[in-house]
Amino acid sequence: MLRLAFAATLALVWGTMAGEPLPGLTAALAVQILASMPRPPRVGQAAALVVVISGTAAAAFAVAAAFADRLLVLTPALGVLFFVGFTMRERAAGRPSLPATMLLNATAVVPVLTVQANVLGAGVVATLGSAAVRAIFIVWFMYALFPAAEEAAATSASAVAARAKGIPLNEHVGTTRTLAKVAIVLPAQLFYLAEPTALAFPALLGLITFLSAEDASVGRVQLTILLLGNLVGSIAAAIASAVLDVGPALPALALMGLLGSLGFARWIIAGRRRPGDAVALTGLVTFLMLFGLAASPTSFEVPVLDRIADIGMLSLYTVGATALLLPLSEPRPPVGSADRAARA
């Protein structure tokens, strides 16, 4: 919990001091990496991750730049990238898949600026690459401060294995779920392509985070929690932004970032024992990205109520579309349960 919260806070502060257009981006990448990896990445893994992030961002930029003035062509092209990302995620069978997550992140955010101007899209690609490097260093530093215990790593691996076993491996269902996720995210992205706004980044990253971490075996309860998670995340960011306006900039940024991150980190840890970890991670990403807008050296003229309303509307859309389009997967009974039931 402390590792995740301090990583998010340090990433916010470092991104702000580095003049990153969106300081919340480094923080969002750091928490996604920490939530996916029970151990610190090795040097080779870290280098590969940076290459993957930069490469996927470049691929999304190339597609968006090629078809920026032809939405009828751009839409299916982006749909293919989303399909590849979600397919990689589904085939991970409950295990973390950072390449899939990073491809989905890049496909969601890079085209929004690229369709406005190629130079803006190229800037986002460079920002993603530098944010990835900072996030990796922060992850290493946090693991040095808070080493991963053997028991915790074993528990995490067991939980992942149990979750993977709880979902039947059905290729047809997996393809259906992947297509459903593409159908959910594409309309949201098309909306922000038509109406570009700074809120596209927290909104789309939050949507991608939820769909990537969504657990088919949990059921609809996580949709109800999603509304609460995004609402809490946006309100917490609004409160933190208000404190940032009246207090010393850097101390206020660190304090409010830490308080908000601690709350969501505790929720994520608790969610690993019951439904809600995917939603808690989505809420944390929403909080970090919205708070990052307030801390950014670039001025984003987005009123606080508009931020909350926009995230709230996207949450309602996500809940409705997910309930309508995503099929439920029945958990596989534990090994030997059928025999015990027969004997009973």
Regions inferred by a protein language model and the residue ranges of each:
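Intrinsically disordered, low-complexity glycine/charged-rich regulatory or linker segments
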Residues: 106-107
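Alpha-helical transmembrane segments and their membrane-interface boundaries
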Residues: 1-98, 112-258, 263-344
